[in-house]
Amino acid sequence: MAAFDEMLPEVSGLRRPYEAYDRWLKEQDPARLTQKMQDAERVFRKTGITFAVYGEQEASERLIPFDIVPRILSGQEWRRLTQGIEQRVQALNAFLDDIYHRQEILRAGRVPRELVAKNEAFLPEMIGVRPPAGVYTHIIGVDIVRISENEFYVLEDNARTPSGVSYMLENRETMMQLFPELFQKIKVRPVENYPQLLRQSLAAVRPQSAKGAPTIAVLTPGSYNSAYFEHAFLADQMGVQLVEGQDLRVVDGHVAMRTTEGYKQIDVLYRRVDDNFLDPLTFRPDSALGVPGIMDVYRAGNITIANAPGTGIADDKAIYSYMPEIVEFYTGRKAILGNIPTWRCSEPDSLKYVLEHISELVIKEVHGSGGYGMLVGPAATKKECQEFAKKLQAKPSNYIAQPTLALSTCPILTEKGLSPRHVDLRPYVLVSDRIQIVPGGLTRVALKEGSLVVNSSQGGGTKDTWVLDD
């Protein structure tokens, strides 16, 4: 099955969102574009935009490849996507509030109780705890794939600590530096105000104990974390402190950070530390990344933690398979954005089907991320399929399977000119007293020809994403 090309489909020819860009592109000298690609790489190296790769003996720091051909969406396409994203985010927040309180969806049998109760991402410590302003998922990254002109599907809900937004911002800034004339010719909706929107959104969910303008900080695990650049970047762009666990302590029932003038109360903590490491008195006792006693402060309502502890259950891949039911249960309407069909390997009939068709399917770990721990059947060897089948049979509940979809393609610039590569899209959503969706998001691209894996940890790159102001 041929993939749908978002710029130049085989059937209909050049699509309207790309018309103005295509006219400009045809006027360009190929040598100039090649030079601009090299300029972009120099910009990223100078800025220090890297990510860490674990499990490799070589240097752990990598530059994420950037392609200068933008992905372009019309305003109409974006409006439809935002409607579906907003509906889904509302349902996710309602689901989290429900499972940590009344558990109506479990009592109704729409989601199996054991799937929640036995899930390692479900935190019993959060039962009965309502976060300030009732918001659990303050920042969400919804991964979306496209199959055809009008078919978009949600691939994954990143409701814990979604990353990549710094690349979205730097991609746009770099494109505007390299091609200022393009942004004069084509009206593209801005993304550069994201840090200000993020700060405003976090301030809007401050706890009632906050006095005056809330003090906000970004909690990072430290410089060895793969996304440390982003943590520092966002703190700097928002004009707030970047802190580590060792900088914080509980003082008089509040979390406070160490300053030259003593300890200062923190009202909102945008944490990029996983749940298990957040509080050694509540979770992992060996954690040096969190703050001893912070969960007591949180339960007392004296700090906002974004995202709330326990939100990981909402982006669990087994829970994902129930998202159509979850959306309908809490919104009363069918999901605007559908799911990719999913086989739950914990179910005997599904496991049987998956084992029989393993070479045709994409199989993922329920708690996996970053493209690790997955099998792309059509790209795997017979031996790899056999070895993965043993894992499935040993722990079927650890896996889900999905059909291998022909993800849409967008052109990238290669030595031989433009060439199509598969892409996905991660729009970023901010939730406070309202839902705000950044126009565009991060387009991830599988740079290897024929590959469907877009994750940067697996060799993927990124593109600037344009939403036309039409």
What is the meaning of each model-derived region?
Residues 1-470:
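Preference for protein termini
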